Amino acid sequence: MAKAPAVGIDLGTTYSCVGVFQHGKVEIIANDQGNRTTPSYVAFTDTERLIGDAAKNKTASNPYRSLDAKRLIGRNFSDTNVKADMKHWPFTVIEEGGRPKIKIEFKGESKTFYAEEISSMVLLKMKETAEAYLGKESVTDAVVTVPAYFNDSQRQATKECGVISGMNILRIINEPTAAAIAYGLDKKGGAERNVLIFDLVGGTFDVSVLTIEEGIFEVKSTSRDTHLGGEDFDNRMVTHSSPEFKRKHKKDITPNKRAVRRLRTACERAKRTLSSSTQAKIEIDSLFEGIDYYTSVTRARFEELNSDLFRGTLEPVENALRDAKLDKEKIHEIVLVGGSTRIPKIQKLQDFFHGKELNKSINPDEAVAIVQ
């Protein structure tokens, strides 16, 4: 059987995807559910381990054992970001040898996992997705993208994820570089070009300024907000909806993690709808103590709830420009990456750049899963 080609994997905080170079272009591969992106979740039930869509579907009924671990990769337990994130996770994180480990109950036993072990399970899912599509015996070689801000420890930890999953990581590529390649910006000839990558995903927000000259990339600056992303927009809707439920029914759902997870899932679905419609319904049967929750939210209300967060996206943009020692007029290309850039208010970013056209024709969830 012929050797499988190398694949490109975007191992994301909330979603991952895999692509392969075939027929003269990169093809993004759909998973066994028919989805081109796969939730970066692993869940442990009383009887089995689930990865991807099946795992995310368990977050409402199984919040303590549904894990998303990329924020922990390559970090120490004492890291201030780890401490901050632990307050929001329903699962338990403990210290072992100075490193964070996730503790869960599985098949009646207490188990602990490093973040790299959890992420390797997601990588394995991507590997299996590619193998099912290609019909090859084994996909072993991969190029994996990482955020530009990842330090050496985090990059090495990402390679370890590959080793654990049985893959050979050919190269680690910066996500903004991958996005620029996806748009063919490295193929545009002529003088040096300045590119701003606006990467707003589920859990984080990154801005990078690159220069490209004769196919050579240089990252001039990066700026980020580790707690600004789609999940934060979801949380605002949850924070708005919980008191509404309490006013209507005199019941407080906030101590009930399962109810809050179900509400968050419904809010995320409504948020996605509001990118293409001006109104969305939130409908949850038996949310809490047998009480149904039905409401609707308009795009205008959604924008109002998140107005400070949307405004907050400009600060990292300004910081990245300042660190790169560039005026915004000197930016030749703006590339949108990440599912949250579908939000119409976010696309108003072009107003800041005096109406400059945005590169957004490629599915923003898939823009960095490239093979070079």
Swiss-Prot record:
Q: Which protein are we looking at?
A: Heat shock 70 kDa protein II
**UniProt key word Nucleotide-binding:** yes
Cite the InterPro entries for this sequence: ATPase_NBD, Heat_shock_70_CS, Hsp_70_fam
User: A Gene Ontology MF term for this entry?
Assistant: ATP binding
Q: Which PANTHER family match?
A: HEAT SHOCK PROTEIN 70KDA
- Stretches of the chain forming a coiled coil according to its record: none
Keyword Nucleotidyltransferase: yes or no? Answer: no
Q: What family classification does the UniProt entry report for this protein?
A: Belongs to the heat shock protein 70 family.
Q: Which UniProt keywords apply?
A: ATP-binding, Nucleotide-binding, Stress response
